[in-house]
Each structure stands twice: as structure tokens, then as C-alpha cells.
Swiss-Prot record:
InterPro entries: Rhodanese-like_dom (IPR001763), Rhodanese-like_dom_sf (IPR036873), Rossmann-like_a/b/a_fold (IPR014729), ThiI_AANH (IPR020536), ThiI_fer (IPR054173), ThiI_N (IPR049961), THII_Thiazole_biosynth_dom (IPR026340), THUMP_dom (IPR004114). Residues 404-484 form the Rhodanese domain. It comes from Histophilus somni (strain 129Pt). Transmembrane segments: none annotated. One of its GO terms (biological process) is tRNA 4-thiouridine biosynthesis. Its EC number is 2.8.1.4. This is tRNA sulfurtransferase. The gene is thiI. One of its GO terms (molecular function) is tRNA-uracil-4 sulfurtransferase activity. Catalyzes the ATP-dependent transfer of a sulfur to tRNA to produce 4-thiouridine in position 8 of tRNAs, which functions as a near-UV photosensor. Also catalyzes the transfer of sulfur to the sulfur carrier protein ThiS, forming ThiS-thiocarboxylate. This is a step in the synthesis of thiazole, in the thiamine biosynthesis pathway. The sulfur is donated as persulfide by IscS. SMART domains: THUMP. Residues 61-165 form the THUMP domain. Pathway: Cofactor biosynthesis; thiamine diphosphate biosynthesis. It catalyses: [ThiI sulfur-carrier protein]-S-sulfanyl-L-cysteine + a uridine in tRNA + 2 reduced [2Fe-2S]-[ferredoxin] + ATP + H(+) = [ThiI sulfur-carrier protein]-L-cysteine + a 4-thiouridine in tRNA + 2 oxidized [2Fe-2S]-[ferredoxin] + AMP + diphosphate; [ThiS sulfur-carrier protein]-C-terminal Gly-Gly-AMP + S-sulfanyl-L-cysteinyl-[cysteine desulfurase] + AH2 = [ThiS sulfur-carrier protein]-C-terminal-Gly-aminoethanethioate + L-cysteinyl-[cysteine desulfurase] + A + AMP + 2 H(+).
Amino acid sequence: MKFIIKLFPEIMIKSESVRKRFVKILTGNIRNVLNKYDDTVAVVKHWDYIEVRSKNIENRILLVELLGRIPGIHHFLEVEEKPFVTLHDIFEQTLSDVATQIENKTFCVRVKRKGKHDFSSLDAERYIGGGLNQAVASAKVQLSKPDVTVRIDIENDKMMLIKARHQGIGGYPIGTQEDVLSLISGGFDSGVSSYMLIRRGSRVHYCFFNLGGATHEIGVKQMAYHIWKRFSGSHKVRFVAINFEQVVAEILEKVDNGQMGVVLKRMMVRAASKVAQRFGIQAIVTGEALGQVSSQTLTNLRLIDEAAESLVLRPLITHDKEQIIAKAKEIGTEDIAKSMPEFCGVISKSPTVKAVKEKIEQEESYFDFSVLESAVQNAQYLDIRQIAEQTKKEVFEVDEITVLSANDVILDIRSPEEVDDKPLEISGQNIILMPFYKLSSHFAELDQSKNYVLYCERGVMSKLQALYLREKGFDNVKVLNKIS
């Protein structure tokens, strides 16, 4: 099984030294991601493409899915490589592969060629296309908008019949740009802004300001873990949790109501700047969009930036909410975001849209900054890969079982895509499909006389969700530890 990885076009127009560095980094990223799932994978870089091979044909769907999420890949071709001697050899091998595909359809042949041959690419297209047209009576050549395009790459003494073309996410390889710290709340905006910086080549770390207790933190961890695993699993990143409940309490007690929103955001960027400086991170990322809420006017954003000691990046600054939600749906964070409460917007009933610097500074003079310092000093730092281990400790009270009783119902909480790829089948067992992001709104609708055993592939999300449901008062939840 072989894939040809085509690079993001902006990589190709870089200087030779920069392009080589980017390709080297992308090659390493691909290897890091794929080797976790398939130890037979070999990744080889070339001047203008990267070659990926695997001996495990059963991993095809998984590898296609993983490659489609790695930043730096514009698209990739699934190819079948065969040796040839003459142009007629290429035709015969192509015929055996595509004859059934072009029956009763229009088709054309497109050839790309490298190396020395006694024929041109156009000669090959005409010869192979003419041969297919004669061999398959019901097929018809049509050069413009055919039903089937037969694509062949010829390189030296080998031909590669392109079985499929898959789109990548583009962007730059992670590690080609400097690290950033994303202020993630679990909502639509922060998840999308994190993804956009990942796609642009930065390693994105996550900073979460907890305003809503353990349940809120669990939800945000789910989103951060989802984004990391899906799009940046090639790199280690940090998840930083800062308890901001006392900071909010101090603001509510001492700051004028209309100024609370801006003051809270200023406290957040102050804290995030300290975290960024500690780890040598160059910028912090927020999901703010111009005019979306009262604190996001140009005047207010300028005042927020003045409190930061790091560069503040806002990749969504010109995006509409509709665009943001569409992107969240595309990257798989929409449903998680739907279940997240918005805390920042509710602390002020009459927020100012045009804050005055002198007024903000006066209100902040009433604030006890030792509260902020304490919050930063007591921040929790976690390797995002350790979320699984931390979850095991947090959900010790949730039963993990291997043997099911008559009253147990398996709740498969994987995403629909995961279920389609690898359906869960246990003879004689009742299985309900309910993606993890729907549990908060739909679990109560289930028959509560039953015990529900949560299942996911690696057990991380099932344990997080079990803890979440326990905190909501549902005691009839367990975790499926192993399928025998």
C-alpha cells in the first residue's frame, strides 16, 4: 500500500533551504502520527513529495483518515505501483484495473511522467485511452468532464495507477512556526482559533480559566484533547488549568458592573502572559471576533491588549459566527461547544462597548492583585497525553467492568465516523449509539432503571463522560474496560 503526499503549495514557493526544512519536519510529523497505529509504515521524503508505504492493507481506512488531518499536506494520492517495460505493458495493467470502472461511462486518461522514455505524456494518454476505448465497448472517451478520470504517474521504469485522491487540510507542518498558547473555553470560537494556529504550523498549548467548577473543566479537556489528538498528535503539548473563581469573585465585589467584562479579559491575558513567558511561548491566541460581544470592540480589544505582556493573536477577528460554527462542525468540535456554558458574558449586566483607559485602571486599583498571583502560582500543568492517566485517578469511584450483567446496556459513545469504521458487535448484548457530545442533553432520556456501560476505543472519553454524568447525579454509569 502506497501513498504519494503532495505538499501545501506555499511550501513549494519557499527558498530551497526553507522548503527542505519544512519537508523534513513534515516527514517527521507524518512518521510520528502513523507509527503509533502501524509499525510497518515507512516514510520517505523526495524533492516535491513524500512517499508513505505500509505492509498492512487492513489499515488503509485508518491511514487515509490520519493523513487527511496532518497540517502541511495539500492532498495525497492512493496509488498502486507496478513495473513496466513498454507502453503496452502500462496499457494492459491499466485495463485490468479499470475495465469495470469505465463500463457504460465516459472517461479520459491523464498521465504525468518523469524520467527518460521513448514516448511523451501525451503519447501515453492517447495510446492507453485508445486501447481502453477499444477494449471496453460500452465506454466512451470524453476529455471534458468525464465520468471517470484514469490517472497514471510514470516514473522511470515504474507506473503508478492512482486509485484515489484525498484532500488534506493544507497549511504548514507543525513545528515550522513558533509555539502559541490558546485561551480555550470550550466554546465554538476558542476551538476553531486553536485549530487555525495548528494549521498554520504552530504547536498550540492550551490555557483554561476555570469559572464553572469540575464539570466545566472536564468539558474543556474533552475539546482540547479532541483537537490535539485529531490534528496535532505528532507533538507534545501542555494543558494549563487556572482556577479563576476567586478572581471572578474579586471582580464582582470590587469592580463597577459596566467594566467587569473588560477587566476580566485583562486579568486573563495577564495570567496567560505569565504562563507563556514561563515556557518561552511567543504569543497567546484568543477566539475573539470584532463586534461579536461587547468586550470585542476595537476600543476594548486595544485596552485588553495593553494588559498583555505577550503578542495577542486573533485568527477569527473578521469571521462571522456562522462561519465559525461551520468550521467547528468541520473539525468536530461543534457538539462539544454546544454543551459548554458561556461564563464570561454573564458577569456584567450592562457591559461597556467603549471602555475608557483611566476608568478601567481606576477600577483595577480596587482589585487585590495577590488573588491573581495566587491563581497563576497554583495553576495545574498537564501533558495533554496524561489526560487519560489523570482521568483514571479522578474517576476511581466509577466501576470498570469486563463482564456484563442482564441489566447492563452498552453505550457506545464514539463519534459516528469511528462507529462506521469499526462497529462494536457483542453477541446478545444491547448496544445504544450515543456520541459523547450528546450525553449531556440526551442521557436523561434513557431508561434510568438500566445500568449504562460507556465504551470508547481507548477509554479516555468514556472515563471523562462517566465522571461528568456522576457529577450530574447519575449513579447508573460504568466504564467498559475490555472487550473479550
